[in-house]
Regions:
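Rossmann-fold cofactor-recognition segment
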Residues: 48-66
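Conserved glycine-rich cofactor-binding loop
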Residues: 11-12
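A conserved structural motif in NAD(P)-dependent oxidoreductases
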Residues: 213-224
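Short, small/polar-rich loop/turn modules that mediate ligand/substrate recognition or access, typified
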Residues: 177, 182, 239-241
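Short C-terminal tail/terminal secondary-structure segment
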Residues: 229, 240-254
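A glycine/serine/threonine-rich, flexible loop-to-helix segment
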Residues: 42-43, 157, 178, 185, ...
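Catalytic loop of short-chain dehydrogenase/reductase
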Residues: 89-178, 190-191
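Conserved glycine-rich Rossmann-like NAD(P)H-binding loop of the short-chain dehydrogenase/reductase
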Residues: 26-42
Length: 254
């Protein structure tokens, strides 16, 4: 059967880099995206096709249950999932407490952020597993950050979501281990992506990372994609339930 990589958040940043690198490694690509213009998607599709693999990009809300089931039904007709990447970056950036009457997080903000960036991993894996699309050797990756353990201004809801994502990844790793399916969270170093640029104080974060990373630079989406592709080709599930830091040493010095 044909082997596919399913990528949520495939149109930019780490998701797009993973789509390209996995295509280079021979994976067919099924990308889910929400906002990028068609011209960007066309460019990605052209590059992926040039690697001699199949590609489908679908514009949809990954949290919409009907759309998710529609995607699963489509995937069942295509083959099996050997790599699943959860790389959704969409959350509310507000403080928890008000100073000078500034807007603060409310219950809808927190619930939405946790569901989109955290809990949705579980919902997708449940459907993939139920549909027998996950097989021995499948690699599942969730994209976390040091924000799951460290606090930044206005990052509270996203930080909560990352903690949920890591916990869900560990639990899924336990429940899928006997099937030879690995689940790991990837903690990238500070990476200059559209998602990072939305975080208040991002320029200070970038400069701090550059100044303190022993490798002397920021992490790039391609850094992450290279390791994701390498692991995805291994067919080995013994490394599972981890938070894998890919950051040039940033975390141990920061």
């Amino acid at each position: 059967m044909k082997q596919w990589a399913l990528i949520l958040g495939a149109s930019s940043g780490i998701g797009a880099a993973c789509a390209k690198k996995l295509a280079e490694a021979g994976f067919n690509i099924y990308g889910i995206y929400l906002r990028k213009p068609q011209s960007v998607i066309d460019g990605l599709e052209d590059y992926i096709k040039s690697q001699g693999v199949e590609v489908q990009f679908h514009k949809m809300n990954a949290m919409n249950e009907d759309k998710r089931l529609e995607a699963i039904d489509n995937l069942k007709k295509l083959g099996i999932i050997k790599c699943f990447i959860h790389s959704i970056a969409f959350g509310t950036l507000k403080p928890m407490l008000s100073k000078n009457d500034e807007p603060v997080l409310d219950s809808k903000n927190i619930e939405m952020t946790i569901n989109v960036m955290g809990s949705s991993l579980v919902y997708w894996v449940q459907e993939l597993h139920k549909s027998n699309l996950l097989v021995k050797g499948t690699q599942i990756f969730s994209m976390t950050s040091s924000g799951g353990r460290r606090q930044w201004p206005s990052y509270g809801a996203v930080s909560m979501a990352k903690a949920v994502l890591e916990s869900a990844s560990r639990q899924l790793a336990i429940e899928l281990a006997d099937g030879g399916i690995a689940v790991n969270a990837i903690q990238a170093g500070v990476t200059d992506t559209p998602a990072l640029r939305k975080i208040p104080g991002n320029e200070e974060m970038i400069q701090y990372a550059i100044d303190n990373n022993p490798s002397g630079r920021l992490t790039t989406p391609e850094d992450i994609a290279s390791y994701v592709a390498l692991i995805s080709q291994s067919n080995d599930s013994w490394m599972t339930g981890n938070v894998i830091r890919i950051d040039g040493g940033e975390d141990i010095t920061g």
